[in-house]
Amino acid sequence: MKKLLIIYPHWIPSNLVGVQRARLIANFLPRHGWHPIIVAVHPDYYTEPLVTELTKTVNADVEVHWCKARKKSRFLPVGDIALRGFSQLVGKAVNVIKDEAPDFIWSPLPSFYTSLVCRRVHEITGVPYGLDYMDPWVHDFPGARFPNKAWFAKRAAMLLEPIAAKKVSLLTGVTSLSYQPVIDRNPHLQGISTGYMPLGFDPSDYRLKPDNTRLLWDGDGDVIPIIYAGAFLPEAHYYIDVLFAVIAEMRRAGKLDQRLRLYFVGTGRGNLDPVSKYAERHGISDIVTEHAERISYLEVLHNLSQSFGVLAIGNRERHYTASKIFQTILSGQRVFPMFHCESTVVGILQESKADNFLVKYNPSIPEREFKNIVARYFAEFINPNNPWAPNLSALDKYSADYSAAKLVRLIEKALCDKRN
């Protein structure tokens, strides 16, 4: 059996979204003739809360090697664990390669600095490596102005990405739009093995029960709960602003069930206004609850499955794929999605017949017309008499099993290209 070394600084029991990419691929690699080996920083050095129940989601044949890192402190105010554990990740990966002789190295991004770890390990060992872009590294950071952090982040990305990608043998991503700009900026990469795989899903995750089965709306009485789970991204603010304006107007017109409640969880704490601020602005803060902190991945699945419906809010960028779309559809509850009309999510929703209430954003549509579209589909979404019967079998080709199989094919092509 061939071996894939996955270098990713976080690993279970981390509750970060990026860990799911590495976990889902690793769980299914053995089905396709590859043994997964993980190199990660030990959880003792994470700054985020740990969720031990997530160990239930990792298959027993996934091999994990831990390394140390420098701890974040007032003397080292660096949050990114790939930076704090850079030399340790390199050292551990090199030792694993000496002992296990893996055939290929692969790393999901972000953390983007892990790409530099891979480049360094390749320089030392000669083992070819691939980078997996879940998000673009070089892009226009919201609010980037000299000399703020966002401005420096973009400049750092522009400087470091060519170094990280210089000798890469494979580029993958959740969509081709994630990695194609890397090739455009680095023309010498033309012709290397490339391909995209969705984050996908593992159906067995939905059979696992969280340790905490309490629902977000427990204690709120007789309510109709609608949930949004995930980060509140900068480009999603426009959607929330329009949606809340629509809900406020429906309420004033007496067209909103008084039991309707919206619960936002895991939205994070960014520099822009939180969801709660938009709710206040539109006068609906009494029916909107925001929990900025994350809850366990298994708790999210449990809450989604018990809700009336799920909000799937994307952003106004066409490359955005919303990996969480699978968990929303598989929740068994109706979904209200808002995405750019060219996002790959639109095709997934249409194929699975989960597009009953789909709002497609088109930059050419006037704002008033877009608001009317949102109002029409949201009214249909909250009407329990409207049908909801997605074709879940259509999602099979987006499963983590399928993604792992495709990754294996791409790696084997990259290895073949390198031999030739």
Role assignments for model-derived ranges:
Residues 1-68, 404, 412, 416-420:
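N-terminal subdomain of nucleotide-sugar transferases
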Residues 5, 217-237, 244-245, 403:
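Conserved donor-binding/catalytic core segment of Leloir-type glycosyltransferases
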Residues 9, 70-77, 99-100, 125-162:
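Acceptor-binding helix/loop patch of EC 2.4 sugar-transfer enzymes
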Residues 113-116, 120-124, 151-171:
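Membrane-proximal helix-turn-helix segments that form the acceptor-binding/catalytic region
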Residues 169, 302-319:
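Acidic donor-binding loop of glycosyltransferase active sites
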Residues 177, 200:
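Carbohydrate-associated surface elements
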Residues 259, 263-268, 272-299:
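Nucleotide-activated donor-binding/catalytic signature segment of Leloir-type glycosyltransferases, i.e.
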Residues 361-375, 379-413:
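A charged, aromatic-enriched C-terminal amphipathic alpha-helix characteristic of glycosyltransferases
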